[in-house]
Amino acid sequence: MTELATVLDRFAFAYLATIAEQRRTHIVAVRPVLVGNTFRIAEPGRTTCRNLGQQPAVTLVWPPSDAEHYSLIVDGIGRLDGHDLIVAPTRAVLHRPAPAAPTDTPTACRSDCIELPVAKDG
């Protein structure tokens, strides 16, 4: 989680994605705070809370400051703690489009990704 904490300084805010019962994605802008091995999001809205009751899997996406930089994508499990949302990360990756280059196979990855270690004891 040390690498993740260091990387977070590059970003101003994130988008939180939750899934509704009808499999519709709900996305809101948030300012997650890393506390130990989890993210704390203050006072999520009623739709986010309702979605968490149906599906606790969430994704946080910190957009890059420009197209040349990485986005940070964190998948996790969310739960409510009083008026806050707690997200325990299950996967974290820095992601950006890779420069155009020929690939040997049609299934080759065409992105520039860096996996970041996350604690599994959330």
Locations of regions flagged by a protein language model:
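Short beta-strand segments
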Residues: 11-44, 73
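Sterically constrained small-residue positions within well-ordered secondary structures
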Residues: 7, 23, 32, 51, ...
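Short, basic/aromatic recognition patches
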Residues: 1-13
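Short, structured beta-strand-loop surface elements
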Residues: 44-106
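Short, cationic low-complexity segments
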Residues: 102-122
